[in-house]
Amino acid sequence: MQGLRGSTRAGFRVINGAALQPLPPINDPRPEIAEIADNAAAMIGAADDREFDVFVSHASEDKEQVVRPLARALQEHGLSVWYDEFELRIGDSLRRKIDSGIARSRFGVVVLSKAFFAKGWTQYELDGLVTMSVGGKQVLLPIWHDISKDEVVRQSPSLADKVALRTSDYSIAEIADEIAAVIKGAAVAD
């Protein structure tokens, strides 16, 4: 065979008297791999098909003082809460888990603060929650923490229009009671 620079020879030889046996059939691993993948997807899907009463969006700076106690208080009310400390594990895709949590929650609690409006991830979550709210698939419940109405208006005029609870006016327990009443009242109406 002639190539661009030179030639190549190929050949084979048959050894007389050698016992020629057919090769054993090659097993195609694809069906087994597909079955394993389907089973894994079913197991993951089963775990991820949970519905949540509420998704809690917040800035990490507000976690200690407001968000962690609020998430726990909501659980004590018997609500299913999507909160990062409850749901995220090492190796998880942050974006996928957040998107999934938002999509599978009936209500979105947003703890608005100066730190909240300064972060990219919280804005990403807020965009998702507002999209779900506008589409009628979720109810947005704002909590204002150490932030004024003017500051909320500057950041998001549409959020300033929503009735909100302020951490300066209500205790965490009172806020949790109010959120639980709204969620449980909506469940009765459904």
Description of each model-found segment:
Residues 52-54, 160-163:
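Short amphipathic alpha-helical segments
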Residues 118:
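Glycine/Thr-rich phosphate-binding loops of Rossmann-like dinucleotide-binding domains
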Residues 148-160:
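Glycine-rich, charge-decorated loop segments at or immediately adjacent to ligand/cofactor-binding or catalytic sites
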Residues 2-111, 121, 130-139, 145-148, ...:
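Conserved N-terminal substructure of TIR/SEFIR domains
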Residues 162-170:
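Short secondary-structure boundary motifs at beta->alpha junctions and helix caps
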Residues 114:
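Short, conserved catalytic or interaction motifs in soluble domains
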